Amino acid sequence: MGTIHLFRKSQRSLVGKLTHEFRLVAADRRSWKILLFGAINLICIGFLLMWCSSTNSIALTAYTYLTIFDLFSLITCLISYWVMVKKPSPVYSFGFERFEVLAVFASTVLAQLGALFILKESAERFLEQPEIHTGRLLVGTFVALFFNLFTMLSVRNKPFAYVSEAASTSWLQEHVADLSRSICGIIPGLSSIFLPRMNPFVLIDIAGALALCITYMLIEINNYYAVDTASAIAIALMTFGTMYPMSVYSGKVLLQTTPPHVFGQLDKLLREVSTLDGVLEVRNEHFWTLGFGTLAGSVHVRIRRDANEQMVLAHVTNRLYTLVSTLTVQIFKDDWIRPTLSSVPIANNMLNLSDHHVITMPSLKAADNLNPVTSTPAKPSSPPPEFSFNTPGKNVNPVILLNTQTRPYGLGLNHGSTPYSSVLNQGFGIPGMGATQGFRTGFTNVPSRYGTNTRGQSRP
């Protein structure tokens, strides 16, 4: 039978959780303005959809989708306020900033799907063009234009403002920029208005309204109904071209990639860290975008054995914190004691052992209290370190040196040749470990698995 919980906390449903989070956001006065714009947006969308049905205009429908996108942007702004008031939890230790990235990505992808739907409907209308009624066409155009511009310019939407600046320019922005340069070449006084990078949302709102005005005039003058379908295709293409760079940028953030524009700055900071006093090596560095304008990273630093860990950690954090706001640094001390010798089979290509000298390791003091990987005192209950830098481990085969090599002194070496029989009978090893065949040779293969010694026993 399972455990009986007398005072078990009741689990909230999904609707209850959403209601609780919505109340948390609504408690902030700054969100009241967004909620008001959202209510007006829903009313405006309802009227526009009715006018789209009465006019039978697919171009007005495509333009209405931009108003629906404004509703998504307002929801994204609410999520941004929710992220500000929420604190990191054990499940989301980095905070909830990725939720607003996900909201931007979802909004732009939905806008592109709406543009694809308009393209599909327009292709069907080219085969059989219906009659377009212009009664509410111009009214719907100006209502949608006014509300879109009023929403974009009145509400400070931090996520979309950042994405529109950081993402690559759309083809519509590039063409408008070329046209602006030509106009400013004739009238230099307009350079302060046209030359800066235009807001892509304002640009597509104005371009879509201009296309609908041209549609209205051509239908009123010549009853040319096909221009409505052409305008719908143009608005859909502009929508897709405007949203695509933003979805790509937010998608890269979700994939935890490093922004290309910070490569040079990160490389410079890592070079400065590698020159700090006590630092021997910087490796396993990984940096990624946690949210819009927030960079996170982790780095492993190998230091000298006599270096102060806290001092090095403070210097490394101080250097990288100027660019990386969320940083994890792991400090490892240098490992200079080699692991214990282990028995290995004699290679077939070693014909005469008398031509070699076997180096025996000096006696290890307090071998039981040393970690064989990092050679630092470790408690019996402490787990092995996660990483080691350029450390072969316990399973590295011994090395046999030739007679022609220089013999080091003061290490307890046996000078002179060792008979073949004594090598096989006596064996070499660490005191207290038993007599084993402990030759250091570079001819046998080094086991590729870390954590298992050559005796077939797994390391704890």
Curated annotation (Swiss-Prot):
It comes from Gallus gallus. Belongs to the cation diffusion facilitator (CDF) transporter (TC 2.A.4) family. SLC30A subfamily. The chain crosses the membrane at residues 34-54, 65-85, 99-119, 135-155, 201-221, 229-249. It is found in: Golgi apparatus, trans-Golgi network membrane. Residues 372-392 are annotated as: Disordered. Heterodimer with SLC30A5; form a functional zinc ion transmembrane transporter. Keywords: Golgi apparatus, Ion transport, Membrane, Transmembrane, Transmembrane helix, Transport, Zinc, Zinc transport. Residues 1-33, 86-98, 156-200, 250-460 are cytoplasmic. One of its GO terms (cellular component) is Golgi apparatus. It holds the Pfam family Cation_efflux. This is Zinc transporter 6. Signal peptide: none annotated. Residues 55-64, 120-134, 222-228 are extracellular. One of its GO terms (biological process) is zinc ion transport. SUPFAM superfamilies: Cation efflux protein transmembrane domain-like. The keyword Transport applies. It is a multi-pass membrane protein. GO terms for molecular function: zinc ion transmembrane transporter activity. It comes from the Eukaryota. Has probably no intrinsic transporter activity but together with SLC30A5 forms a functional zinc ion:proton antiporter heterodimer, mediating zinc entry into the lumen of organelles along the secretory pathway. As part of that zinc ion:proton antiporter, contributes to zinc ion homeostasis within the early secretory pathway and regulates the activation and folding of enzymes like alkaline phosphatases and enzymes involved in phosphatidylinositol glycan anchor biosynthesis. InterPro entries: Cation_efflux, Cation_efflux_TMD_sf, CDF_SLC30A.
